[in-house]
């Protein structure tokens, strides 16, 4: 593989384990949501996101109903921008009081640092809100890695399974699609990126995917089990 001009990476299942997100972050936000909404619901930023939830369900409803809706969305792993924003705010409090640190695979932390040192700009694209992404990297168990990242993208740029989202990102960072390498564990995301000409690599970590995906499903995406296998 030739050296890309930019690297775009997912987080969950790519730089970090799926289990940390599913077993630590999601339950934490679910437990904290009722108290957080009741305590901060009148804050303009929080109310903005709560209003988006109300608009989504199409009703003028009390906060208790919004809380129940948000908890249901967490259980369903709903990729709703308002949910992701509120989760990010809750996790921010958790990071600040050291309730947890964000999991980062050692190979990912080392390789991101090496690529940054080599002058390759790094970008993050995750369904989690941009503030949540920044907190994740700033409070990782490998230390503060947020300074390695040139820019961050979330679902406000579009769905991760739509090619148009990757076109927007390429335009934003000012690099030809063919010179961007996108790293993800989700084949549908890689398919969408590849349709724009972006290079792709599938992360298939044994911890997250004990049974390898079939060759037919993987298609033409390069398949690796760690960042250390990405050589250019």
UniProtKB/Swiss-Prot annotation:
<dbReference type="InterPro" id="IPR006439">
    <property type="entry name" value="HAD-SF_hydro_IA"/>
</dbReference>
<dbReference type="GO" id="GO:0000287">
    <property type="term" value="F:magnesium ion binding"/>
</dbReference>
<keyword id="KW-0028">Amino-acid biosynthesis</keyword>
<comment type="similarity">
    <text>Belongs to the HAD-like hydrolase superfamily. MasA/MtnC family.</text>
</comment>
<comment type="function">
    <text>Bifunctional enzyme that catalyzes the enolization of 2,3-diketo-5-methylthiopentyl-1-phosphate (DK-MTP-1-P) into the intermediate 2-hydroxy-3-keto-5-methylthiopentenyl-1-phosphate (HK-MTPenyl-1-P), which is then dephosphorylated to form the acireductone 1,2-dihydroxy-3-keto-5-methylthiopentene (DHK-MTPene).</text>
</comment>
<protein>
    <recommendedName>
        <fullName>Enolase-phosphatase E1</fullName>
        <ecNumber>3.1.3.77</ecNumber>
    </recommendedName>
</protein>
<comment type="pathway">
    <text>Amino-acid biosynthesis; L-methionine biosynthesis via salvage pathway; L-methionine from S-methyl-5-thio-alpha-D-ribose 1-phosphate: step 4/6.</text>
</comment>
<dbReference type="InterPro" id="IPR023943">
    <property type="entry name" value="Enolase-ppase_E1"/>
</dbReference>
<keyword id="KW-0460">Magnesium</keyword>
<comment type="pathway">
    <text>Amino-acid biosynthesis; L-methionine biosynthesis via salvage pathway; L-methionine from S-methyl-5-thio-alpha-D-ribose 1-phosphate: step 3/6.</text>
</comment>
<dbReference type="Pfam" id="PF00702">
    <property type="entry name" value="Hydrolase"/>
</dbReference>
<keyword id="KW-0479">Metal-binding</keyword>
<dbReference type="InterPro" id="IPR023214">
    <property type="entry name" value="HAD_sf"/>
</dbReference>
<dbReference type="GO" id="GO:0043716">
    <property type="term" value="F:2-hydroxy-3-keto-5-methylthiopentenyl-1-phosphate phosphatase activity"/>
</dbReference>
<comment type="subunit">
    <text>Monomer.</text>
</comment>
<keyword id="KW-0378">Hydrolase</keyword>
<dbReference type="InterPro" id="IPR036412">
    <property type="entry name" value="HAD-like_sf"/>
</dbReference>
<dbReference type="GO" id="GO:0043874">
    <property type="term" value="F:acireductone synthase activity"/>
</dbReference>
<dbReference type="GO" id="GO:0043715">
    <property type="term" value="F:2,3-diketo-5-methylthiopentyl-1-phosphate enolase activity"/>
</dbReference>
<dbReference type="GO" id="GO:0019509">
    <property type="term" value="P:L-methionine salvage from methylthioadenosine"/>
</dbReference>
<keyword id="KW-0486">Methionine biosynthesis</keyword>
């Amino acid at each position: 593989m030739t050296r890309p001009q930019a690297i775009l990476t997912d987080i969950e299942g790519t730089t970090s384990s799926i289990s940390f997100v599913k077993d630590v972050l999601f339950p934490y936000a679910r437990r904290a949501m009722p108290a957080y909404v009741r305590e901060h619901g009148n804050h303009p930023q929080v109310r903005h996101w709560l209003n988006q939830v109300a608009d989504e369900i199409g009703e003028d409803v009390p906060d208790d109903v919004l809380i129940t809706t948000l908890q249901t969305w967490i259980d369903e792993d709903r990729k709703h921008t308002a949910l992701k924003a509120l989760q990010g705010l809750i996790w921010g409090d958790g990071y600040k009081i050291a309730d947890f640190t964000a999991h980062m695979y050692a190979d990912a932390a080392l390789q991101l640092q090496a690529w940054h040192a080599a002058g390759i700009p790094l970008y993050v694209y995750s369904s989690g809100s941009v503030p949540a992404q920044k907190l994740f990297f700033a409070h990782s168990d490998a230390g503060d890695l947020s300074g390695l990242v040139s820019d961050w993208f979330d679902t406000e740029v579009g769905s991760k399974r739509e090619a148009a989202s990757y076109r927007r990102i390429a335009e934003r960072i000012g690099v030809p699609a063919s010179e961007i390498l996108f790293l993800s564990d989700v084949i549908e995301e890689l398919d969408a990126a590849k349709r724009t000409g972006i290079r792709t690599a599938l992360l298939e970590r044994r911890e997250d995917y004990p049974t390898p995906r079939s060759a037919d499903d993987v298609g033409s995406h390069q398949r690796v089990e760690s960042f250390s296998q990405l050589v250019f």
